[in-house]
């Protein structure tokens, strides 16, 4: 039997999903769908890389996982497409999988916030890396690179976009030593 909070979450999530499909964020190049028609708690999302950015021409896939007490608790959002970005975790480990996102709306989630509020912030994130809120390793490697060698950072970001997010990307070809198999 479902508890009240899960039933409420299902209603809220279903309504948000319907709203986003009735009035999609096409001006931002964002679409949402379901991985499985029987599970409203897991969405797939696509974001087109904005023009004149490191991510231009890319098609980025994300997964949105809603908790049973949504909207009282924040959803989990992860990039499934590898992306070289200051505010997206790219290091793969058992406890911190690829693609976790650092954005203010998620970090400062308030009861009643919505995915519709977060999606434009994700699009804005592709316009500009935020060095004040990096999702980085303990040595701040990417942040230092972004600040001290922006040309190299840009090359890496464009490489990742071309390699993993272009329409012709071969998603099974990753740089040596990288294992993204759990995202398939």
List each language-model region with its residue ranges.
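Domain-scale recognition of soluble eukaryotic interaction modules
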Residues: 1-13, 20, 74-184
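N-terminal onset of structured domains
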Residues: 3, 17, 21-59
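Acidic/polar N-terminal loop/beta-strand segments that form early-domain functional surfaces
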Residues: 48-50, 65-67, 80-82
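A generic structural motif
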Residues: 51-53, 66-68, 106-111
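Proline-anchored loop/turn motifs at beta-strand termini and strand-loop-strand connectors
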Residues: 65-75
């Amino acid at each position: 039997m479902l508890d009240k909070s899960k039933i409420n979450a299902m209603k809220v999530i279903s309504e948000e999903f319907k709203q986003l499909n009735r009035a999609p964020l096409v001006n931002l190049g964002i679409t949402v769908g379901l991985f499985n028609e029987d599970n409203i708690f897991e969405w797939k999302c696509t974001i087109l890389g904005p023009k004149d950015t490191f991510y231009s021409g890319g098609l980025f896939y994300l997964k949105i996982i809603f908790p049973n007490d949504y909207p009282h608790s924040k959803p989990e959002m992860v990039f499934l497409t590898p992306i070289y970005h200051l505010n997206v975790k790219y290091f793969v480990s058992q406890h911190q999988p690829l693609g976790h996102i650092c954005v203010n709306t998620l970090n400062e989630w308030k009861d009643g916030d919505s995915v519709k509020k977060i999606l434009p912030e994700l699009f804005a994130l592709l316009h500009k890396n935020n060095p004040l809120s990096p999702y980085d390793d303990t040595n701040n490697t990417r942040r230092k690179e972004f600040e001290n060698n922006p040309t190299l950072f840009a090359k890496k970001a464009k490489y990742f976009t071309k390699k993993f997010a272009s329409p012709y990307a071969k998603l099974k070809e990753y740089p040596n030593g990288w294992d993204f198999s759990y995202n398939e």
